[in-house]
Amino acid sequence: MRGQRRWAHPFTLIRRLFGNAVFSSLTRRIVFFNLVALVVLVGGIMYLNQFREGLIDARVESLLTQGEIIAGAISASASVDTNSITIDPEKLLELQAGESITPLPSDEDLEFPIIQERVAPVLRRLISPTRTRARLFDADADLLLDSRHLYSGGQVLRFDLPPVDPESPSLADEFGTWFNRLLQPGDLPLYKEPPGGNGSIYPEVMNALTGVRGAVVRVTEKGELIVSVAVPVQRFRAVLGVLLLSTQAGDIDKIVHAERLAIIRVFGVAALVNVILSLLLSSTIANPLRRLSAAAIRVRRGGAKEREEIPDFSSRQDEIGNLSVALREMTTALYDRIAAIENFAADVSHELKNPLTSLRSAVETLPLARNEESKKRLMDVIQHDVRRLDRLISDISDASRLDAELARADAKKVDLEKLLGDLVEISRQIRGSKKPVLLDFVVDRKDNPRASFIVSGYELRIGQIITNLIENARSFVPEQNGRIVVRLTRSRLRCIVYVEDNGPGIQAEDIDRIFERFYTDRPEGEDFGQNSGLGLSISRQIAEAHGGTLRAENIAGKDGRISGARFVLSLPAGPHP
């Protein structure tokens, strides 16, 4: 148990520092992709091997310089072979008086043999400070000297015998060999020791015998690099032999390996920093998203009475902050809509209950009526309540589907001047016989004679607003000399419709209440229940859905008294022509 607790501490610490975001899918993706980018970068650096290529080039230049020096020292130690001189008798007869009988051969005719006893000390002295292997071949590419077998006097020689049972390479060694081969070019020739000591298997040696120096990079069976350079040993213009200098197997690989270890160490530190920064980044993303998600779940499970608060990240000034603001606004609108639906349901229940109660009372009383007059009066009450219920249900249905209908419909251009003219004319014809009212329509273009009255919206619903306002005004104008004026004007950005009447006006405390659902304040003499109280509420709802406003105010006369009511509908207008 102690061991388990000891192992649990790091995870507990990580959870405290970064929260549960460490184990989230988003966090794992951020860490993974950041590490993949870093791994690709490091892998590309190792695969391109620019450091190794530069190291090989530097080693080739170094070996060529070293080879030129050693080849010069070897050629200087060579002597002319004068053990036998051939004299041509015919040339002897051609000699003039005073000429020497000794032949004077040209440089090409002289031979400068490489004497091993003289060259070996020179080669040993120049090679010993380095780990370079030197091999000297004669003009026939036969091996004369090998620095591996140059020994000074009195030196004790020791040879390590191979083990009786050679151990198989470990998994780490095999992986190292495979990794080296993976990062090395696949076109490098395989290094082999020359059979019988003849250097003709080396192309650079054969080229050097023609006087051209060269360099070749080979690889051993273990994947280790060997760099070889061949330099001709020349005396005057005669090639006496070839000096072949080679690096020890693994010398370059050790340097490259050390460089790769340094890169891996840097990669480890960078990966650690990358993971920490990724965790910090994910904590600033995943944790807020998790809190927003949890709050959204609580909103879904809760009700309108207990409002759940969405976390406020608006101070972040980023996409998460914008998401937080949007969710908060959406949640507020959702709660307001739920509350409105609940209030609407309560109001509907209350409004339906009144006519139902009256209807029930009339139905229960009808069998008890003693005469026909009482029965007729009760039947009139029943019919009146039925009509009232029908009107209520129709208006309630219209109000309930209004939002959905406005959300589904496509807004179109509506010419208010034409729409209002048609509605006023229809209203004159339909209502003219019931209450004589003077209904005027005025278009005000004083500020701009060419002003257009085009708005974007739903013609049927905008017409419903105007119809409700005209009918509402008609119910309040006096029986004699009643007048309603519909006036259309425009400001720079809005079209404004005024519906004015010369009725009694509106009580100051009721100017806002008249737009509440089921609120009725009818004039004296009008039958109770003729209006559902939803007309003005629906009209304001339609106006707000169009981005407009609907308000009411009283008209003050010259003496300061109220001379009527005015309803003002304002809608966003299109541009001026």
Swiss-Prot record:
The modification Phosphohistidine is found at H350. Residues 347-575 form the Histidine kinase domain. Keywords: ATP-binding, Cell inner membrane, Cell membrane, Exopolysaccharide synthesis, Kinase, Membrane, Nucleotide-binding, Phosphoprotein, Transferase, Transmembrane, Transmembrane helix, Two-component regulatory system. Its main location: membrane. Residues 283-339 form the HAMP domain. One of its GO terms (molecular function) is ATP binding. GO terms for biological process: polysaccharide biosynthetic process. It is an enzyme of class 2 (transferase). The chain crosses the membrane at residues 30-50, 261-281. Residues 1-29, 282-577 are cytoplasmic. Residues 51-260 are periplasmic. InterPro entries: HAMP_dom, HATPase_C_sf, His_kinase_dom, HisK_dim/P_dom, HisK_dim/P_sf, Sensor_TM1, Sig_transdc_His_kin-like_C, Stimulus_sens_dom. Its EC number is 2.7.13.3. It is found in: Cell inner membrane. GO terms for cellular component: plasma membrane. PANTHER family: SENSOR HISTIDINE KINASE TRCS (PTHR45436:SF5), SENSOR HISTIDINE KINASE YKOH (PTHR45436). Homodimer. Member of a two-component regulatory system ChvG(ExoS)/ChvI involved in regulating the production of succinoglycan. Activates ChvI by phosphorylation. This is Sensor protein ChvG. The gene is chvG.
